[in-house]
């Protein structure tokens, strides 16, 4: 999600919903080159972060906040890793690159389209076949009042493994501002490369995102879009809508055709060894999940392609979620939060394919089904859940808890250890008492049998934050934002590599308050 910082003030841009290509399905089009207009704002190296123990603070540059970390490990070299985050002390996303297994990290700013733009929603992939790292981001123009306009989806290549970053390529164009006659507000993009050497599409990189279309501020739709590249990110296919339609699963409609699954968010990509690509996303149109009219509980859905993204299956149901309008407390910004907190949360997680077994996938998410929900005064006991399919998404197991504790857990991220086949799930955890602090934990094993390791060596305190303050009685210094996701990736050596948003470091400006940085740990 999009955030922008002016001094220590926060502007949260409103998401408004992209026009589909039209017709009954995506039109097959030739590859085209989409180059960002105007001058490029160059990447900039800032500092080197060194490991000082079990946890490493990757933000060695300044005291301004960072959040939403993602991490990727080079399949051909497990000591080579790249992480990235939102950075509020500069124009751009932050990159963190290590070639020595996390002992040290080169840190700096990503490239963007031009100096008037700001980066957001950072995600990085490594394309082993073409020897290039690819960083996807949203690049917005910000008005003086903090409104985000003309948000493009861009991809920046790095030919040296993440030490320098080239001019970004626009793969999806945004259009307009919130109240314009037509606005296309791109949000929550994701990027992944098929690094399976036996795949027919080895070296193909996929990017997906949500395209929110609105007319004069009125929401119309928000389908999932997709594009792909076969040459290390130099050329990209025309974007196509892939979220599809289902009269059984997508019964509610704001403005679209009956059965169109076009009110979506939070797409994530994974590929199986045989080259099948899967995209999972949340959708809010399944009225059979609503406990009351227009409650908009989400469902997780999945689509797949067996021919490298040229054609896509109809969406299939994965799991229903307890995350509707009356299922969580609401924070000062009108977003869902956790009891006693103000940080916005959601149920989004990710899908990951088994690296050895075609059609075997795991998907993780969180919701409040075990708390007080469907109430005017909801109380959270948010849990992380995992579901599994063995047949490429046709059938899924029932959700099972990853952590058996009774406190809030949220922001899950999963990966599969290629050495032993175990699933790892990283998440934030308040512990059984649901107190003011949280830690970050890693559960490893198999559904129904996980072993938990607390990765963070100190707790984080989002109720006493230097930045993103709620400013309300009883919670004046509570943060309203700490990103929307965290990151986990296993290397071919079997090590787990975790990055998360951490709030342990005291502020140099205000005694008793804490900063927001990206931390790394290896297990």
Residue ranges and their predicted role:
Residues 19-523:
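C-terminal PAP-associated
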Residues 2-13:
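Bacterial N-terminal signal peptides
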């Amino acid at each position: 999600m999009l955030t922008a910082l002016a001094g220590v003030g926060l502007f949260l841009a409103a998401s408004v919903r992209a026009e589909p290509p039209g017709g009954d399905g995506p039109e097959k089009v030739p590859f085209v080159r989409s180059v960002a207009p105007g001058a490029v704002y160059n990447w900039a190296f800032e500092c080197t972060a060194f490991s000082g123990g079990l946890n490493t603070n990757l933000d060695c540059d300044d005291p301004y906040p960072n959040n939403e970390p993602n991490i990727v490990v080079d399949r051909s070299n497990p000591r080579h890793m790249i992480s990235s985050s939102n950075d509020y002390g500069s124009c751009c996303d932050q990159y963190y690159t290590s070639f020595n297994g996390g002992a040290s990290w080169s840190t700096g700013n990503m490239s963007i389209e031009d100096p008037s733009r700001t980066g957001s929603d950072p995600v990085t992939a490594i394309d082993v076949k073409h020897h290039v790292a690819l960083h996807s981001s949203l690049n917005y123009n910000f008005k003086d009042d903090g409104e985000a306009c003309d948000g493009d989806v861009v991809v920046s290549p790095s030919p040296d493994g993440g030490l320098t970053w080239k001019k970004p390529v626009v793969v999806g164009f945004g259009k307009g501002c919130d109240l314009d006659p037509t606005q296309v507000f791109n949000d929550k993009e994701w990027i992944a490369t098929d690094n399976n050497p036996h795949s027919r599409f080895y070296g193909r990189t996929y990017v997906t995102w949500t395209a929110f279309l609105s007319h004069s501020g009125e929401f119309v739709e928000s389908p999932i879009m997709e594009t792909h590249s076969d040459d290390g990110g130099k050329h990209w296919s025309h974007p196509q809508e892939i979220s599809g339609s289902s009269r059984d699963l997508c019964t509610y409609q704001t403005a679209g055709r009956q059965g169109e699954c076009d009110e979506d968010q939070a797409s994530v990509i994974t590929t199986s060894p045989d080259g099948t690509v899967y995209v999972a996303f949340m959708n809010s149109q399944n009225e059979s999940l609503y406990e009351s009219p227009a409650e908009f509980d989400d469902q997780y859905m999945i689509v797949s392609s067996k021919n490298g993204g040229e054609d896509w299956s109809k969406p299939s149901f994965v799991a229903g979620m307890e995350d509707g309008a009356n299922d969580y407390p609401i924070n000062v910004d009108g977003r869902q939060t956790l009891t006693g907190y103000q940080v916005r949360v959601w149920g989004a997680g990710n899908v990951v394919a088994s690296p050895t077994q075609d059609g075997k996938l795991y998907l993780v998410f969180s919701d409040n089904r075990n708390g007080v929900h469907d109430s005017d005064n909801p109380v959270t006991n948010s849990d992380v859940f995992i579901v599994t399919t063995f047949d490429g998404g046709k059938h899924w197991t029932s959700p099972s808890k990853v952590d058996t504790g009774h406190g809030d857990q949220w922001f899950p991220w999963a990966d599969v250890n290629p050495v032993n086949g175990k699933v790892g799930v990283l998440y934030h955890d308040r512990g059984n008492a649901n107190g003011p602090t949280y830690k970050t934990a890693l559960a490893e094993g198999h559904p129904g049998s996980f072993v938990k390791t607390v990765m963070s060596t100190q707790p984080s305190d989002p109720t006493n934050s230097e930045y993103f303050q709620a400013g309300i009685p009883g919670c004046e210094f509570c943060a309203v934002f700490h990103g929307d996701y965290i990151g986990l990736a296993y290397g071919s050596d079997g090590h787990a590599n975790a990055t998360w948003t951490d709030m342990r470091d005291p502020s140099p400006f205000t005694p008793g308050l804490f900063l927001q940085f990206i931390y790394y740990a290896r297990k």
